[in-house]
């Protein structure tokens, strides 16, 4: 039984019902429908913290999905899982791959900035201020890109950029 049919969360059930209706009425190929089913099941597993299952579904969705825009969201969600698992290098790779396919994902830029900022803080704790500054500069660049895409969002990042004099 597909995960979407056993999910107990009301919002997930509602999403699944709407998604199934849309899949029936919007003209799509069977491959696209199957890719979306895996993507949907991946999101469901991810929301429940079942990251291994989510990754399996996302990888299968990637195998089937041909649209670069849709692939960008699959890659982004894989990046989220790696971030949650503390696998920051892998997460950065997947966010970057998502942005290659869809450069209008401010949340990917934001997450990349958060990882870089975190690494900057780690470098400070290790006493390496030069490396820390490099990480902070990279975080600033990613936050600037996120803010450029959605100027009203990322207020804390905007404040950090101003306080650290990295905002132009």
Swiss-Prot record:
Alphabetical UniProt keywords: Chloroplast, Membrane, Photosynthesis, Plastid, Repeat, Thylakoid, TPR repeat
Family matches, as SUPFAM superfamilies: TPR-like
Record GO cellular component, one term: chloroplast thylakoid membrane
Subcellular location: Plastid, Chloroplast thylakoid membrane
Membrane topology field: Peripheral membrane protein
PROSITE patterns to which the protein is assigned, alphabetical: TPR, TPR_REGION
Main location: plastid
GO biological process: photosynthesis
Entry keyword NADP: no
InterPro entries, A to Z: PSI_Ycf3_assembly, TPR-like_helical_dom_sf, TPR_rpt, Ycf3/AcsC/BcsC/TPR_MFPF
TPR repeats: 35-68, 72-105, 120-153
Gene3D superfamilies found in the cross-reference section: Tetratricopeptide repeat domain
Entry annotated with the keyword Membrane: yes
SMART domains named among the record's database cross-references: TPR
Protein family according to the UniProt entry: Belongs to the Ycf3 family.
Function: Essential for the assembly of the photosystem I (PSI) complex. May act as a chaperone-like factor to guide the assembly of the PSI subunits.
Full protein name: Photosystem I assembly protein Ycf3
Organism: Gossypium hirsutum (Upland cotton)
Source taxonomy: Eukaryota, Viridiplantae, Streptophyta, Embryophyta, Tracheophyta
Protein's gene: ycf3
């Amino acid at each position: 039984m597909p995960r979407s049919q056993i999910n107990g969360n009301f919002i997930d059930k509602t999403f699944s019902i709407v998604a199934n209706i849309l899949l029936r009425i919007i003209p799509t190929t069977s491959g696209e429908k199957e890719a979306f089913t895996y993507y949907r099941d991946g999101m469901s597993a991810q929301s429940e913290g079942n990251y291994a299952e989510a990754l399996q579904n996302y990888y299968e969705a990637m195998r089937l999905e041909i649209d670069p825009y849709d692939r960008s969201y699959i890659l982004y969600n894989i990046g989220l899982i790696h971030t949650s698992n503390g696998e920051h290098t892998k997460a950065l790779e997947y966010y970057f791959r998502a942005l290659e396919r869809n450069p209008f994902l401010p949340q990917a830029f934001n997450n990349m900035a958060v990882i870089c900022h975190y690494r900057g803080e780690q470098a400070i704790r290790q006493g390496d201020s030069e490396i820390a500054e490099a990480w902070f500069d990279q975080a600033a660049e990613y936050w600037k890109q996120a803010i450029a895409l959605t100027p009203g969002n990322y207020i804390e990042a905007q404040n950090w950029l101003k306080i650290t004099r990295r905002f132009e």
